[in-house]
Amino acid sequence: MQYSEIMVRYGELSTKGKNRMRFINQLKRNMKHVLSIYPEVSIRADRDRAHIYLNGANYVPVAESLKQIFGIQAFSPSYKVEKSVPALEKAVQAIMVELHHEGLTFKISSKRSDHQFELDSRELNQVLGSAVFAVLPDIKAQMNHPNVNLKVEIREEAAYLSYENIKGAGGLPVGTAGKGMLMLSGGIDSPVAGYLALKRGVNIEAVHFASPPYTSPGALKKAQDLTRKLTKFGGNIQFIEVPFTEIQEEIKAKAPEAYLMTLTRRFMMRIADRIREERSGLVIINGESLGQVASQTLESMQAINAVTTTPVIRPVVTMDKLEIIDIAEKIDTFAISIQPFEDCCTIFAPDRPKTNPKIKNVEQYEARLDIEGLVARAVAGINITEITPQEESQDEVDVLIEDLL
């Protein structure tokens, strides 16, 4: 027997009252985006649950994709069966024979939405249970906590059988909490920050600062591949490439080395905020972890944050590096993050960066720079690409790495 559909149960959105259908419709859109790589699949989202119709698609990869989508509490693959007692008996017998092992206990749980069916739920439980005993006379029925709870649903068009309950990603559907601009480097931390923001329903757009020729095409592709990894949790993501070469060269030429990182990060924050404003975002998200590097002391964060009044969310701020790496490995971004491409945060990194920058000094050094002109030119030069849930090319990555060696 081959699975015909997957029944999806919603997560936290079940508590959202009058906004429930808005959350469900957003989840449906997200599922469509993520599952778009399976053209046979179709989706119906009702108030109590959603149905993923496989239409011949391979269940295994579809299920793996569903496990990643935020807003799903659990799901169950189902078999579609002719709506007749003989067909149901045959199907139930086939399933239980396949699952059977010594000591296995089972239960039949029937439910009818088609009340014209010839048997009520209790009668159907008895008939199908007897069918199981006919082929497995030694099997034991158990009403509380059986090994297998075989669910039978009688609908208008057919009957559906399921016994698995697979845990989903939980959280909220991406897009239900508004839009945020993720400051995405090529490192380990910022993709994890993006993942955690997605889990709480934030629709992220990835802002990546590129400084060619100091940063390579490989560094850009690395950031795009990290973004692609994040699409599996809620669908397409806008990737915003910011030209940052002029700004870094100006800072390098006109500011003391110890303040390079602080000034660079302040420009990044200004640009991310300008893009947020133009693209109707609500927050800025970054991967700062307290005390991990010089620019992530409380004093540095305060100096960098001073250029904006926009809320800055730091999902990994209290995590240590090993905790962040654990999540990066779980979401499959770690191997990409450690590819040997430098990003714009590392190319001009000072040997002894200021860990306690004074705002007065920072503003004095910035007075040497055309802040508004530099920011405006960077924002005017952005390049936006929509990243979709497609497979990244490992061959292309290997070629780019070879070019560095």
Curated annotation (Swiss-Prot):
Alphabetized GO MF terms: ATP binding; CCA tRNA nucleotidyltransferase activity; tRNA binding; tRNA-uracil-4 sulfurtransferase activity
EC supergroup of this enzyme: transferase
Residues of the THUMP domain: 60-165
Catalytic activity: [ThiI sulfur-carrier protein]-S-sulfanyl-L-cysteine + a uridine in tRNA + 2 reduced [2Fe-2S]-[ferredoxin] + ATP + H(+) = [ThiI sulfur-carrier protein]-L-cysteine + a 4-thiouridine in tRNA + 2 oxidized [2Fe-2S]-[ferredoxin] + AMP + diphosphate; [ThiS sulfur-carrier protein]-C-terminal Gly-Gly-AMP + S-sulfanyl-L-cysteinyl-[cysteine desulfurase] + AH2 = [ThiS sulfur-carrier protein]-C-terminal-Gly-aminoethanethioate + L-cysteinyl-[cysteine desulfurase] + A + AMP + 2 H(+)
GO cellular component: cytosol
Example GO biological process: thiamine diphosphate biosynthetic process
Family as reported in the entry's similarity comment: Belongs to the ThiI family.
Name of the protein this chain belongs to: Probable tRNA sulfurtransferase
Localization per record: Cytoplasm
Matching InterPro entries: Rossmann-like_a/b/a_fold, ThiI_AANH, ThiI_fer, ThiI_N, THUMP_dom, THUMP_ThiI, tRNA_STrfase, tRNA_sulfurtransferase_ThiI
PANTHER family hit by this protein: TRNA SULFURTRANSFERASE
Record has Cytoplasm as a keyword: yes
Principal subcellular localization: cytoplasm
Function: Catalyzes the ATP-dependent transfer of a sulfur to tRNA to produce 4-thiouridine in position 8 of tRNAs, which functions as a near-UV photosensor. Also catalyzes the transfer of sulfur to the sulfur carrier protein ThiS, forming ThiS-thiocarboxylate. This is a step in the synthesis of thiazole, in the thiamine biosynthesis pathway. The sulfur is donated as persulfide by IscS.
Name of the gene: thiI
Pathway(s) this gene product operates in, as recorded in its UniProt entry: Cofactor biosynthesis; thiamine diphosphate biosynthesis
EC number per UniProt: 2.8.1.4
Residues noted as binding ATP in the record, renumbered to the chain: M183, L184, H208, F209, R265, G287, Q296
Record key words, sorted: ATP-binding, Cytoplasm, Nucleotide-binding, RNA-binding, Thiamine biosynthesis, Transferase, tRNA-binding
